[in-house]
Amino acid sequence: MNNVKSKEENEKEEKNKTKNIEDGISIGIYNAHSRELKNIYTQILATTFFKDSKIDIVPISKEIKEYLNILDIEYTCIDKFIPTEELMNRIKRNDINVYVTFTECSPMFPMESFEEGVPCLIGNNNDYFIGSKLREYVCVDREDDPREIRDKIKIVLENKEEVLKLYREWKNNFNNEVKKQVKEFLEG
């Protein structure tokens, strides 16, 4: 068995060490645009509780830029949807991503974020992580409450290593269950 870690694995481990929230954090908000169903305004408002935080938003609308400027929030952005590879590169630069929408039943974005080693908050409109302590960490029950989103961000960042460990455990269990079900289906 090879115990040598790649440079990428070492970088992920270093980034995932517990970070002091007071140092400012990088928060990603992606694929939300300005549609109300995507809940972008509440997610942005939740970030104002973190001094010196910076948000990365893709795509961004003129209205969202105005909102960010009114709230005096530091941000980076791209005005349009971008290729997946470029989005993945942006995702991994953050301490946490938020995807607390009102409408998603099985969004890919949270899985993509976790796969890049970055925890992602979700809304309570899906069945991700049910039966796992991970759901208690990352699922926002009241999507329209910026204080709950803020509290979840704090809790996840304070327990980032455990959250990522729980994700890996959940993923392993999920993959095993899928293999079992596919086998049962194929064997009739």
Regions found by a protein language model. Name each.
Residues 17-38, 44-49, 56:
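Conserved donor-binding/catalytic core segment of Leloir-type glycosyltransferases
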Residues 101-103:
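Aromatic "clamp/platform" in nucleotide-sugar-dependent glycosyltransferases that forms part
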Residues 64-83, 88:
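Nucleotide-activated donor-binding/catalytic signature segment of Leloir-type glycosyltransferases, i.e.
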Residues 88, 110-115, 129:
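Short alpha-helical segment that forms part of, or immediately flanks, the ligand-binding pocket
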Residues 143-144, 157-188:
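A charged, aromatic-enriched C-terminal amphipathic alpha-helix characteristic of glycosyltransferases
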